[in-house]
Curated annotation (Swiss-Prot):
Residues 19-24 form a propeptide. It comes from the Eukaryota. Glycans are attached at residues 44, 251. One of its GO terms (cellular component) is extracellular region. One of its GO terms (biological process) is proteolysis. Keywords: Blood coagulation cascade activating toxin, Disulfide bond, Glycoprotein, Hemostasis impairing toxin, Hydrolase, Protease, Secreted, Serine protease, Signal, Toxin, Zymogen. This is Thrombin-like enzyme saxthrombin.
Length: 258
């Protein structure tokens, strides 16, 4: 079963696709406090439920399946229980999902751009991560991070984000693991073939950083997490560069690539 990685009232909703917004990094270690300065934590009335990535002082990029009616975004967070001096909280001013997204296909165009209600000030623990200048190559070393579950079956949510390194795999690996993953979906396949390292429930919307560039958004994967032949699937950011840049420039009617 594909796991959509989202936290909703601490329940994993097992649907035909279960996305990762409730998942944590499996097989990782606690992130260094300065290792995730672009990582954004999403909170609603029930608590943490998704992540995003700050791409400039006014915009955050996340997964479309992380959309929620009422939520706040916290930047500069490490421990969810201990306030950082430079931590900042923002609300969404505008949210943009691909107008040509197929609503009945949760895996299609799983990307959302959020304009903040006010600009973020860069600080010791808050620094934006630029959009990629080129697409990633198979074999690239990629960095994953998040507050998602750190155990693959029984959900265990950490107080601090966990980080791990995985590899960008050939798309054929994910096509074999997920026959329902259509070839036209603009996604990346990343993990460890022997298993044991993966994003998991609660990590949805967070970044996949390959060779220092922001290349992917946590979208979905298998349950249990960390299965070698069923790696994580990530929205391919590079393919959406034009859509993202057009919206930021004020062209809010632009469509996403098919």
């Amino acid at each position: 079963m594909v796991l959509i990685r989202v936290l909703a009232n601490l329940l994993i909703l097992q649907l035909s696709y279960a996305q990762k917004s409730s998942e944590l990094v499996i097989g990782g270690d606690e992130c260094n406090i300065n290792e995730h300065r672009s990582l954004v934590a999403f909170f609603n009335s029930t608590g943490f439920f998704c992540s995003g990535t700050l791409i400039n002082e006014e915009w955050v990029l996340t997964a479309a399946h992380c959309d929620n009616t009422n939520f706040q975004m916290k930047l500069g967070v490490h421990s969810k229980k201990v306030l950082n001096e430079d931590e900042q909280t923002r609300n969404p001013k505008e949210k943009f999902i691909c107008p040509n997204k197929k609503n009945d296909e949760v895996l299609d165009k799983d990307i959302m751009l959020i304009k903040l209600d006010s600009r973020v000030s860069n600080s010791e623990h808050i620094v934006p991560l630029s959009l990629p200048s080129s697409p990633p190559s198979v074999g690239s070393v990629c960095h994953i991070m998040g507050w998602g579950s750190i155990t693959p079956i029984k959900v265990t949510y950490p107080d601090v984000p966990y980080c791990a390194y995985i590899n960008l795999l050939d798309d054929a690996v994910c096509q074999a693991g997920y026959p329902e993953l259509l070839t036209e979906y603009r996604t990346l396949c990343a993990g460890i073939l022997e298993g044991g390292k993966d994003t998991c429930g609660g990590d949805s919307g967070g970044p996949l950083i390959c060779n220092g560039q922001f290349q992917g958004i946590v979208s979905f994967g298998a349950h249990p997490c960390g299965q070698g032949l069923k790696p994580g699937v990530y929205t391919k950011v590079f393919d959406y560069n034009h859509w993202i840049q057009s919206i930021i420039a004020g062209n809010t009617t632009v469509t996403c690539p098919q």
